């Protein structure tokens, strides 16, 4: 009985370890939602009336100037192909740039809708920046709202600040994990 229990325990732990390892075939598709809150920043905006991200409402405020750029960031853990879509609402034409390609995307909905941007090749693992800029407001007073990116593909796991993780720590935490080289010699604090 003890041997059977020990064997069953070892097999159970091994199966659990394999299922948590994230191992996948090269052709397996993954999907990840990269939310505005915690993963996006306003990287360009006019000083007179700057746009900003309202974390609580998960929306872009004052997004009515073509100079404003909203940049999403995430990390692809492997190379491969990925399809990017915007979870967005509004009535406008926006420009989406990533991995050396730029696509124009038409937003035409009063409710959040999934709008495909295109398929992109991830040539190597690493951080990916997605810039979104408004080109033309078709209706209303702003370019609308992009609440998240939906990324699908075989580029391995995607790392970003998750919806259940505090955006406070998501925006501030990464700086505590950067490499720091200790100074040589005596140091006085």
Short names for language-model regions:
Residues 1-9:
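Bacterial N-terminal signal peptides that target proteins for export
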Residues 8-17:
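Bacterial N-terminal signal peptides
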Residues 24-189:
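Extracytoplasmic
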């Amino acid at each position: 009985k003890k041997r059977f229990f020990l064997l069953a325990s070892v097999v159970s732990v091994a199966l659990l370890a394999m299922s948590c390892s994230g191992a996948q075939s090269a052709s397996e598709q993954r999907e990840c939602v990269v939310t505005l809150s915690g993963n996006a920043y306003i990287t360009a905006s006019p000083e007179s009336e700057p746009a900003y991200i309202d974390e609580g409402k998960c929306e872009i405020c004052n997004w009515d100037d073509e100079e404003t750029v909203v940049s999403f960031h995430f990390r692809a853990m492997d190379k491969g192909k990925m399809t990017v879509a915007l979870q967005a609402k509004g009535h406008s034409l926006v420009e989406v740039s990533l991995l050396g390609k730029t696509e124009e995307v038409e937003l035409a909905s009063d409710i959040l809708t999934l709008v495909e941007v295109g398929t992109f090749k991830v040539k190597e693992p690493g951080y990916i920046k997605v810039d979104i800029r408004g080109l033309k407001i078709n209706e209303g007073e702003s370019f609308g709202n992009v609440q998240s990116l939906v990324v699908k593909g075989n580029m391995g796991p995607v790392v970003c600040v998750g919806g259940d993780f505090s955006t406070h720590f998501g925006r501030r935490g990464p700086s505590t994990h950067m490499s720091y080289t200790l100074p040589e010699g005596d140091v006085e604090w």
